[in-house]
Amino acid sequence: MGMPAAKKGDTITATDVHFIQPPGTAPPTTVQHPFKGRINGNLSANVNIMGKPAAMMNSTATNTPAHQPIGGTFVKPPANRGSIIAGSPTVFINGKPAARSGDTAITCNDPVDLPVGKVVAKGTVFIG
């Protein structure tokens, strides 16, 4: 059986790691930050899932609330963006793999963005 199809308003979740510069002369440290972004960009203009634009590979999410520095300042300000990098191998929307619950997303991390995010979708439309 397939997985729920992703659409506008579904989420990408992850745990991101960012470098924080503590006050004074201490070296930067890594701090984990939760990522929870609503899928809201690069959606299909002509395919809807449950009345909302369908998500596909390369659809994006904005982390809300944005990451906040804990114990100092960010060495590099986070982008607070996620992008779906995997989808269905058999179902395509506008020529791109359809996104489903459980598909992988890349999210903002230091020193480089990493594929640690997962799509979380609910609904009545399932895609294999």
Question: What do these predicted regions represent?
Answer:
Residues M1-G128:
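Intrinsically disordered, low-complexity proline/glycine-rich segments
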